[in-house]
């Protein structure tokens, strides 16, 4: 990180614990990246939804895009399971399904679907004030408002929605080694 110019501060175990009062942290030390940040996906999506609606946009839930009326480079309408939707602009926000959803348009979306695994504690006994990476366990820990998310492992699997119990168990097993109170 230092070679790349990323700001960092090595921490003793005591300094790591001092960043998160009330949390029992078992560590040999840490590294603080003061410019790191994190967000709560539900809060972000709620804010984006509100901004779209304030700006006069329209959001349609439970509607599938089935094709496009798009002669040449002009998009006249999105064909959906609820009928055609015409507009001056469109936002395609289908995540991993965006390449499939955009079929028929003259766009190339170089995306690869993948899935990560996470466990969210709804009411942790104590809350972290900064995010953490449990390097040896390969688990990221992110405070999200009143919840705490432990996430690890990323699989590049295409649109396979199956869940590996082994990967989930690996995350669960790692938590008490670093945070005994969880």
Question: Can you say where each PLM-predicted feature lies in the sequence?
Answer:
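Dinucleotide-binding Rossmann-like beta1-alpha1 core, especially the glycine-rich loop
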Residues: 1-13
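Helical element adjacent to the flavin cofactor pocket in flavoenzyme catalytic cores
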Residues: 23-89
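A conserved beta-strand/loop capping segment in the N-terminal third of enzymes
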Residues: 1, 19-25
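Conserved beta-strand segments of alpha/beta enzyme cores
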Residues: 7-9, 58, 77, 108
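Active-site substrate-recognition segment that forms the wall
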Residues: 67-75, 83-182
């Amino acid at each position: 990180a230092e070679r790349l110019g990323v700001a960092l501060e090595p921490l003793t175990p005591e300094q790591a614990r001092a960043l998160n009062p009330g949390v029992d942290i078992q560590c040999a030390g840490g590294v603080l990246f003061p410019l790191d940040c994190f967000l709560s996906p539900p809060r972000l999506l709620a804010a984006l939804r509100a901004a779209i609606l304030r700006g006069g946009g329209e959001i349609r839930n439970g509607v599938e895009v089935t094709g496009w009326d798009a002669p040449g480079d002009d998009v006249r309408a999105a064909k959906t399971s609820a009928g055609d939707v015409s507009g001056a602009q469109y936002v395609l926000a289908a995540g991993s399904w965006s390449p499939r959803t955009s079929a028929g348009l003259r766009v190339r979306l170089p995306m690869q679907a993948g899935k990560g695994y996470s466990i969210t504690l709804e009411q942790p006994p104590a809350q972290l004030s900064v995010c953490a990476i449990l390097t040896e366990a390969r688990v990221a820990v992110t405070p999200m408002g009143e919840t705490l998310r432990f996430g690890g492992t990323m699989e590049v699997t295409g649109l396979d929605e199956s869940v590996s119990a082994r990967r989930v168990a690996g995350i669960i097993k790692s938590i008490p080694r670093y945070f005994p109170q969880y």
